[in-house]
Amino acid sequence: PFQYLCISDDTDLSDDSLWSGQKYNIERLADKLCDKARAQLIVDALHKYLADEYTCRALCFCVNKRHADFMAEQLRLYGFNAQSLTSDTPADERKQLAKDLREGTLHYLCVVDIFNEGVDIPEVDTVLFLRPTESLTIFLQQLGRGLRLSAGKTELTVLDFVAQANRKYDFASRFRALTLQPEKNIQKQIKEGFTLLPLGCSIVMEKKARQYILDNISSAIYNKNRIVNEINSYATIPTLTQFLENNGQDIRILYQGSNCWSSLK
């Protein structure tokens, strides 16, 4: 099971200048995230929410090498055992870092994409989302790194640092994918505290983080890719009525340009 905590992040990621095409511009996003005040906020959350922040085995997902190196350095400055691992890390060093995390001699490994898939460290008991992840597939792969079964491991703790996001960013699909009934209205689920989760799981949102997410869903800019991604986040393809009700959107969003419902499914 997982305990998913959404932490309020005061970083403003809503400006269109941070966005390129279908995702955030990596370098501009890193400029915003490599911030000492934000690092302090992250450390404060570790102290507040983790049972033992000095002995956990955490994967920390970062936006690029600069961000991963920055976060590892900041965590070390606060007394945590932390390292960074990216595609530039030599193979032998990668293996050693993975071994250290597995054995508990390393507690925080700040990574970029490389741990999305193909690397199995069942002992990981904590995941930190230190960046917004646009791809639902990558988000689920990252979450899955911590959901492996391991002796003595009772649950996964997830800290997701939620900032004010660009209107093109999709929070809805992410949280819908975590519920047992993704066809249900996701805004209602958020407001009611997620009553449709797997046994033993929870999603808890700090007040400001919850409002950021609800505001984002309400003001979302829909294009064809966004709509297709949302449809694909359902367990079964929804009807037109279900889709509109669950997203709180006007039918006109589906008929912009040459779009139509049958072509989007």
Predicted regions and their residues:
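Short glycine-/polar-rich loops that comprise or flank the Walker A/P-loop
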Residues: 1-2, 78-81, 122-126, 134, ...
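Long, largely alpha-helical accessory region at the distal end of helicase-like NTP-driven motors
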Residues: 41-42, 47-48, 52, 171, ...
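Conserved helicase ATPase core of P-loop NTP-dependent helicases/translocases
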Residues: 59, 67-116
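Amphipathic alpha-helical transducer elements in NTP-driven molecular machines
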Residues: 39-40, 95, 108, 112, ...
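Conserved segment of the helicase C-terminal RecA-like domain
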Residues: 132-179
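SF2 helicase motor core recognition
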Residues: 109-127, 143-148
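Conserved interdomain linker/interface between the two RecA-like ATPase lobes of SF2 helicase motors
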Residues: 1-59
